Amino acid sequence: MIASEIFERGVQDPFCQDCDYEDETDVQSFLGSNDLNDFVNSKLASFSFQNSSKSNNSHHSSSTNAGNTSRHIGNHTIGHHLRKIKTAPHHLYGFVPANSTNNSNEPIRPSPRRIRANSSTLIHQLSRQSTRQSSLGDAADSCFDHKCIKPRSRHSSCYGIPTHLYGLEKYVSSELDSLAVANDQSNDLTSPLTSVSTPASNSNSYLNLNSSSAAYPSSYLSNEKNNRLKLISHGKISSNNVPGHSGNLNHYHRERTPSNLRRESFSLLSNGSSSSPLQTRNNSYSNSLVKSPSNSSLNTSVASSNEESSPHTSNCLEERNPRRKSFIKLSLASSFSN
């Protein structure tokens, strides 16, 4: 808990001195305030005594023990002007009671000056870098340099704070954000197009096959057919080039099932006409198209074209597929026999 509070203070104020004296209260509570003050004063007295003995040997030899004690008492006031002693755990060997054998004339080592890395300067240096690759490389170099200049005193909990981590928000490049936004916009734009294109691909095959008849009105098709018939009568165009039923492919590729054949035979018997089987088949097919409720506009155009081009369809069918006539005759014969 204490370390977290010191960490927060060190981050908020990088120049604070709380880390230098973080262990002083713990040591005082452990040894007691009176014993600590007496021991520090005795250490300061011995330190000042050794310095004075080196500077003035003659005066030290002529002085008596009483004079030495009085000099020690008079120099106790120097401790108020000196810097506080480091009280880290690895310095606790000095806080041994005075009656122990380790109480030698060993002077107290001055505390090393601490080299602290300012987190704000590190963040400022990282924020000045331009690209993401260079920032990663420079951050690695700065971390290596920061390890090289680590302080000698390791007692502080503030040492080891990864202050360069506060510049990580700079690593999130704006280019990545722009690419993500562009991808989202492209997905939003392509989704309605795909939804519109799917029903177009799944449209009715009958409408796709009859696109020519659906695109043009019936009046236009009838006028075109009349013009072709006039050209055929004058001998300018051969009858082989005349498409039957306005290019309706379903008329020639109609599924030949037994039910359809029976329907054709029934229509032939009910009409009682002496026309050819192909002509009766065309008439029955046109009637079935007219009676169907779906695609009424397309069926009426197909029926009108059937009635106009009925004299020519037999020739076209015989020339295109000569086996169809024999097949129809055999099917009609089998239906009559049944």
UniProtKB/Swiss-Prot annotation:
- Signal peptide: which range, if any? none
Biased composition regions of type Low complexity, renumbered to the chain: 50-70, 267-306
> Residue spans with biased composition (Polar residues)?
307-316
Give the residue ranges for region: Disordered.
Answer: 50-75, 267-322
What's its job?
A: Could influence the NAM7/UPF1 function, possibly at the level of mRNA turnover. Participates in mitochondrial biogenesis.
The family annotation for this protein states:
Belongs to the ISF1/MBR1 family.
What's this protein's name? Increasing suppression factor 1
Recorded source organism is Saccharomyces cerevisiae (strain ATCC 204508 / S288c)
